[in-house]
Design a protein with these regions (language model features):
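Bacterial N-terminal signal peptides that target proteins for export
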Residues: 2-13
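Bacterial signal peptide processing site
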Residues: 25-27
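Extracytoplasmic low-complexity, Pro/Thr/Ser/Ala/Gly-rich segments
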Residues: 30-94
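Mature extracytoplasmic domains of secretory-pathway proteins
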Residues: 72-136
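Extracellularly exposed regions in secreted/surface proteins, prominently low-complexity, repeat-rich
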Residues: 140-176
Length: 176
C-alpha cells in the first residue's frame, strides 16, 4: 500500500510541475494590450478612438499613397494592436495619431511597399536601417525591432522589421 501511495504522489508532483511549466510558457504567448487597462484611447481632436473596434474608420483617415483618401495595410495583414500616438500628441500641440501594429507575409509586405511608397519592395533588405534619432518613431520602441526600415508618405509612416513579417503603420493628424 505504501508503495502505491508513493507512486501516486510522484505522479501528482510531476503533473503539477508540468502544469506550472505550461502556465509559465503560455503567459509569454499572451499579448499585452496596446494601451494600459482603464486608459482612454480617445485623443483630443482625433476622429476615432484608438482601438480595434474602430480600425476600419481609422484607416479612412488622412491621405494615403498617390494622394488618395485613406490608408491600407498589406494584403492579408493581421492587426495585432491599435494604440494612440500619445508621444506625438504630447510633442505636437493639437496633434493626434494612431499606431497600428500588424503582421503579414514577406511577399505581401514587399508588394505593399512597391505599391504605396516610392521604393521597390524587392530591395528593402539592402536599404539602410531607420534612423532611431528620427522624431517619426516616438510612439514605437525601436530597440525591440530588429533592423528597422521606414518610409513616410503623406500623413503616414510605415515602419517594418527585417527580416520582414512585422510592421507598424503610424497615422498622424493635427488641426489644419
Amino acid at each position: 500500500m505504501c508503495r502505491r501511495f508513493l507512486v501516486a504522489w510522484r505522479v501528482v508532483v510531476v503533473v503539477l510541475a508540468c502544469a506550472c511549466l505550461t502556465a509559465c510558457s503560455l503567459s509569454r504567448l499572451v499579448s499585452v494590450p496596446a494601451t494600459p487597462v482603464g486608459t482612454s484611447t480617445v485623443q483630443e481632436g482625433a476622429p476615432y478612438p484608438a482601438d480595434m473596434e474602430h480600425l476600419d474608420q481609422i484607416l479612412t483617415v488622412g491621405r494615403g499613397p498617390n494622394g488618395r483618401k485613406g490608408q491600407e495595410l498589406p494584403e492579408g495583414a493581421q492587426v495585432v494592436s491599435v494604440a494612440p500616438a500619445l508621444n506625438f500628441a504630447a510633442d505636437f500641440p493639437g496633434g493626434w495619431g494612431y499606431v497600428i501594429a500588424f503582421t503579414a507575409t514577406e511577399e505581401a509586405i514587399r508588394d505593399y511597399v512597391t505599391r504605396n511608397t516610392g521604393f521597390n519592395g524587392k530591395y528593402i533588405d539592402n536599404s539602410p536601417a531607420a534612423n532611431p534619432e528620427s522624431n517619426r518613431f516616438e510612439d514605437v520602441d525601436l530597440s525591440a525591432i530588429q533592423n528597422p526600415w521606414s518610409a513616410g508618405f503623406w500623413d503616414v509612416v510605415l515602419l517594418l522589421e527585417r527580416p520582414l513579417g512585422r510592421g507598424w503603420l503610424i497615422i498622424r493628424g493635427a488641426p489644419r
